[in-house]
Swiss-Prot record:
Protein name: Large ribosomal subunit protein uL1
Phylogenetic classification of the source organism: Bacteria, Pseudomonadati, Pseudomonadota, Betaproteobacteria, Burkholderiales
Keyword tRNA-binding: yes
Entry keywords, A to Z: Repressor, Ribonucleoprotein, Ribosomal protein, RNA-binding, rRNA-binding, Translation regulation, tRNA-binding
HAMAP family, A to Z: Ribosomal_uL1_B
Amino acid sequence: MAKISKRRQAFAAKVDRQKLYAIEEALSLVKECASAKFDESIDVAVQLGIDAKKSDQVVRGSVVLPAGTGKSVRVAVFAQGEKAEQARAAGAEIVGMEDLAEQIKAGQMDFDIVIASPDTMRIVGTLGQILGPRGLMPNPKVGTVTPDVATAVKNAKAGQVQFRVDKAGIIHATIGRASFEPTALRSNLSALIEALQKAKPATSKGVYLRKIALSSTMGVGVRVDQGTLAAQ
């Protein structure tokens, strides 16, 4: 732990917490810090100009990152008949109805995302207290309650990430791994920012994207100059 602290302190000394770094430099600094023995995730925190206490200003959605997340995702799907077959063909590891619900109630949750066809919500709705606290409850706002379960499965496998603003008005998301090329991380970040722009509440006033900061799993935050995101 002492070694980690020393490494973190050494990196922190290189970063001016008040400075806005061009995206290329910010990514370079973050990747430099990601020197742990595992492939650290590269995360982004976006401070939004919204009032998270107001229900009409809750920002929530999903986006498929063009370069993926670098993570293997196991998908469970509530569907029956033809839709169940389509889900399996699309790559879903677990497909079921009441049997899947019973597995979940028994604590057997070997999956990372749950997708549901609308006609199965009578079953899924009974699992809210189990799936909700784990962030696994299907929701149409993030595309996990849909009649097109096959596409939802493919999106999840392709690197779809869900986002939801927290109580402080901040969006937290992973845009890749330290092993990713800077161009891949940048394209993923751009896709996320574009999705956030599209999800902007009509009642949000003033500056919407207030602050953007990047960090690795074990690193410190590096603030990004938003003006450099559009530059190619």
